[in-house]
């Protein structure tokens, strides 16, 4: 099987596994991203996410993560849904956390894809990534032609919008790159205008310390900063505002991944149920969920802050 057939076989298998899109980019040092990342960190836009300052060189050079790396295979897995929590007054959870933790779901699919590659192609080296190492996934996905970086810093695909997870396989296999996609945000500033905490401080620049997702998930302080009281738009875990207002998301298809579907119990909890939430219910609801990241105490803190 020649290189072009390898490429198509990988794309076909990725589609079979449920990935919406699969693209290829050539491994190289991310020269353009280096000063941007350095400035972002100097401005302390990482907030409490101190790990973002770690492994600076590895973030910019995949060869430091995978020996003899030649190609980044980027993949998109859709989580878009029109399902909503029943009570409009209930504290809100980001769509990506409605179902099973995406790390588990995607890693299973990536490992199956990598096994397929080794079976079909032979002795190759490869490593799978889904938020599990310092990889600039949106940058590589853009280079692979899977979308462009929106002004909210989310990757946007013209046919699917931005409600998808990004994952990678970095491999020593040499495959022709697909080439980057043009930016189609134009003069639109809907995401910037809609952000409840004004976290998008400039087009393509997010101050993570102001982002509701950071505040409700990453920030481990016992009390949330008072400057954000009344500005959280009733979000208790994550935030979808900058994606909900993005015009490109009107093209997004509904995901059909069974493991991403929310339980009826989760959707039906009302405002009082959430305020009275007990640890036993939390453990049952979020046993295999990304919401566990904030822990019971963190979720209760967030809910209390919204009152």
Which residue stretches match the model-derived regions?
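Short, charged low-complexity linear segments at domain edges
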Residues: 156-180, 208-228, 278-283
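Alpha-helix boundary/capping detector
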Residues: 40, 99, 143-144, 221, ...
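Iron-sulfur cluster-binding cysteine motifs and their immediate structural context
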Residues: 16, 190-216, 220, 232-259
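Conserved active-site and cofactor/substrate-binding residues in soluble primary-metabolism enzymes
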Residues: 108, 164, 206, 237, ...
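Alpha-helical scaffold domains
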Residues: 49, 224-307
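Auxiliary alpha/beta "docking" domains used to position bulky ligands
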Residues: 1-184, 233-234
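SIR2/sirtuin NAD+-dependent deacylase catalytic core
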Residues: 187
């Amino acid at each position: 099987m020649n290189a072009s057939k390898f490429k198509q076989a990988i794309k076909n298998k990725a589609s079979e596994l449920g990935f919406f899109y699969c693209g290829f980019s050539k491994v190289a040092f991310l020269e353009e991203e280096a000063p941007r990342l350095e400035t972002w960190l100097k401005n302390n836009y990482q907030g409490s996410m101190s790990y973002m300052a770690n492994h600076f060189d590895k973030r910019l050079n995949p060869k430091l993560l995978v020996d003899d790396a030649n190609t980044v295979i980027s993949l998109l897995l859709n989580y878009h849904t029109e399902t909503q929590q029943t009570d409009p007054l209930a504290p809100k959870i980001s769509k990506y956390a409605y179902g099973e933790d995406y790390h588990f779901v995607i890693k299973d699919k990536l490992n199956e894809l990598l096994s397929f590659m080794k079976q079909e192609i032979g002795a190759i080296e490869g490593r799978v990534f889904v938020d599990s190492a310092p990889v600039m996934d949106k940058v590589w996905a853009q280079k692979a032609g899977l979308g462009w970086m929106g002004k909210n810093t989310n990757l946007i695909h013209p046919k699917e919008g931005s409600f998808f997870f990004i994952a990678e396989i970095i491999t020593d296999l040499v495959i022709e790159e697909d080439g980057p996609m043009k930016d189609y945000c134009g003069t639109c500033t809907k995401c910037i205008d809609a952000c409840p905490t004004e976290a998008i401080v400039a087009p393509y620049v997010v101050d993570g310390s102001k982002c509701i997702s950071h505040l409700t998930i990453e920030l481990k302080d016992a009390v949330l900063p008072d400057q954000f009281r009344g500005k959280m738009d009733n979000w208790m875990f994550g935030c979808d505002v900058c994606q909900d207002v993005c015009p490109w998301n009107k093209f997004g298809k509904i995901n059909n991944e069974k493991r991403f579907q929310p339980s009826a119990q989760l959707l039906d909890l009302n405002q009082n149920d959430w305020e009275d939430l007990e640890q036993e219910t939390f453990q049952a609801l979020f046993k295999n969920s990304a919401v566990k990241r904030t822990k019971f105490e963190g979720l209760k803190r967030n809910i209390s802050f919204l009152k």
